[in-house]
Amino acid sequence: EIMLAHRIQQGLLLQKALTCGLEIAEQAAELGITVADVLVCCGGGGLTSGIALALEQDAPNMRVRPVEPEGFDDVCRSLISGKIERNPTTLGSLCDAIVTLSPGQLTFPIMQRLCHAGITVNEEKALHAVQLAHDRLKITVEPGGAVALAAALFHGDQITSDCLIAVASGGNVDRDVFERA
């Protein structure tokens, strides 16, 4: 029964993420962008797979790329192996909001079908992205929600499109962590 509740939660998050994907497609179309790498912070895959589903229909040339913290890259490894991989623990990361033991049972098949290679970033880069988001973009984002921005800023060598969209999510950052950034 716990697993059933977890699957329901994944489904609800996936539905909410569809809205984000639709907004990305709409704004990209307004700007004339038809091809882009779309970097999405990824834990269990609800946000990532929901965005991928929306873009599949409305912007099929967008390349959704999950982004995870180094050492907690279960989705990236799962996409490479073709089967669900597990992290040994969920403890020990500043990006705790997106750290999961494994991709979701509902979300992994969607990501497997629709997502491109994932990217991992270290915590130092995630913290730097938190700081830059605050200082330059005037938004507060937690480290886990800043990993996509960190990938955009510091892993340009892994970006394959001329256009780039990075999803920043979650503003629940502890004062101590924010001050470290």
Segments from the language model and where they lie:
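PLP-dependent amino-acid enzyme catalytic core
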Residues: 1-181
